[in-house]
């Protein structure tokens, strides 16, 4: 008796494929455009997996390519878990699971918004300013180590987020939606925002220097020594760094009024130069 049973080989992504997706994801923003934003970058990152799951250059491979040319936009580092989840979905679909294009794109769209809300405050509002402050503090002493330290630390975090994000998303599959659901994203975003504001508040007092040398009084003591009281002396007694803090609040108010940041910078230059020329501001 001849056994005519046909066996179908399960299609499985390898660690090499996942590393390929990770490496390509570093060029995520390379083809950004106003029409579909990061769609080309997402599709480019998925190519190693698509080649593995659809080895023949047939209609299935073409459909997989087209599937990932839909609109996509999120914080580029936290796109890694979305890539991982998409890898798991594509693998299941290639093995016969009933997963249509709408389901895959729906997962991508559903994750890209919440993760962008987490990635922006964490990376742009916290990680980068903290490492930049650390590097700038060292660079101000004349050391080249400052910018190098910033470059190395920031890229270590960036690469680790991308690599482990892809691996985590792939291992969890669609369960990642549940893991990052509920109040977790909100708490993480709130915590990162508070930390970022704390760091920026410390930087305002450290880096911003305003001196108002207008003389309020001159008093000569019994020894003949003259004591000069300026406006800046009084302000420092009330609250050190009060003027820089008020200027920061003014910038925030102008930004909320949609004033171009370039005009704010130019305005500060004009105020500083004019104030120094008139004697209202000092070094």
From Swiss-Prot:
Q: Where are the transmembrane segments?
A: 101-140, 145-173, 184-209, 242-255, 262-280
Q: How does the record classify its membrane topology? A: Multi-pass membrane protein
Taking the first listed entry, what is the main subcellular location of this protein, grouped into a coarse class?
membrane
Residue ranges that the UniProt entry lists as topological domain Periplasmic? 141-144, 210-241, 281-283
Localization annotation: Cell inner membrane
Residues that the record marks as modified (N-formylmethionine) are 1
- Indicate yes or no for the key word Lyase: no
Q: Which residues lie within the membrane without crossing it?
A: 15-52, 60-92
Induction line: Expression of the manXYZ operon is positively regulated by the cAMP-CRP complex and negatively regulated by the Mlc transcriptional repressor. Expression is also weakly repressed by NagC.
Keyword list, A-Z: Cell inner membrane, Cell membrane, Formylation, Membrane, Phosphotransferase system, Sugar transport, Transmembrane, Transmembrane helix, Transport
Q: Which residues form the PTS EIID domain?
A: 11-281
Q: Which domain of life is it from?
A: Bacteria
Provide GO CC annotations from the record.
membrane; plasma membrane; transmembrane transporter complex
Tell me, what does this protein do in biology? The phosphoenolpyruvate-dependent sugar phosphotransferase system (sugar PTS), a major carbohydrate active transport system, catalyzes the phosphorylation of incoming sugar substrates concomitantly with their translocation across the cell membrane. The enzyme II ManXYZ PTS system is involved in mannose transport.
How is this protein named in the record? PTS system mannose-specific EIID component
Q: According to the entry, what is the taxonomic lineage of the organism?
A: Bacteria, Pseudomonadati, Pseudomonadota, Gammaproteobacteria, Enterobacterales
Gene name on record? Answer: manZ
């Amino acid at each position: 008796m001849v056994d005519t049973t046909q066996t179908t080989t399960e299609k499985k992504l390898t660690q090499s494929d996942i590393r390929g997706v990770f490496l390509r994801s570093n060029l995520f923003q390379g083809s950004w455009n106003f029409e579909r934003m990061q769609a080309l970058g997402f599709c480019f990152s998925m190519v190693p997996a698509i080649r593995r799951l659809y080895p023949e250059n047939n209609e299935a491979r073409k459909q997989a390519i087209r599937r990932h040319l839909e609109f996509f936009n999120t914080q580029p580092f936290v796109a890694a878990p979305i890539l991982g989840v998409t890898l798991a979905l594509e693998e299941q679909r290639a093995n016969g699971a009933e997963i249509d294009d709408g389901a895959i794109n729906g997962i991508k769209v559903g994750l890209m918004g919440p993760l962008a809300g987490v990635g922006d405050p964490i990376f742009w509002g916290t990680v980068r300013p903290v490492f930049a402050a650390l590097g700038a503090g060292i660079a101000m002493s004349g050391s080249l180590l400052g910018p190098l330290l910033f470059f190395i630390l920031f890229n270590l975090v960036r690469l680790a987020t991308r690599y482990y994000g892809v691996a985590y998303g792939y291992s969890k599959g669609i369960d990642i939606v549940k893991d990052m659901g509920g109040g977790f994203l909100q708490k993480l975003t709130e915590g990162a925002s508070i930390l970022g504001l704390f760091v920026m508040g410390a930087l305002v007092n450290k880096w911003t220097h305003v001196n108002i040398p207008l003389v309020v009084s001159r008093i000569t003591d019994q020894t003949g020594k003259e004591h000069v009281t300026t406006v800046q002396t009084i302000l420092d007694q009330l609250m050190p760094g009060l003027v820089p803090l008020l200027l920061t609040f003014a910038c925030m108010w102008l930004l909320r009024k949609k004033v171009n940041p370039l005009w704010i910078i130019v305005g500060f230059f004009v105020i500083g130069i004019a104030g120094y020329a008139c004697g209202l501001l000092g070094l």
